[in-house]
Amino acid sequence: MTDTFFKASRMGKVVYPVTEMLDEAYLLEPPEFEGHWDPHVWNDINAWSKAAEAVLLAFCEQDPDHCDRYKENAKAYQKRLELLDKYVHKTMASIPKEKRILITAHDAFNYFGRAYDVEGVGIQGLTTESEAGIEDIN
């Protein structure tokens, strides 16, 4: 993903890698990708709300004439995210903790697991470039 950002930047595109705009204490760094943040922050609604603030700042920087409108939209969006977060917490609480296991092909739900107390198992790992074997599923 970093390469994509660099290429776009070299082509004159404005690039704002959202995870780099968030507080590092909030981000997850997978051991197999030391030095790189897990980019799947949208799977934690609170993290995505923080990302919306980062996007708001980027929009206001690029288009200051419409900053007030961006702020209104961000505030409304964050309110919807807050309601969604409450719903997910309530729904997840209805599942016994020992049964909260999310098995996926691609290990993209670490933020979701942390936010909602769910064990995530990605049989392919964090990247879609690896292959899952039968031993990973058993």
Where are these regions (language model features)?
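Extracytoplasmic metal-acquisition and chelation regions
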Residues: 1-138
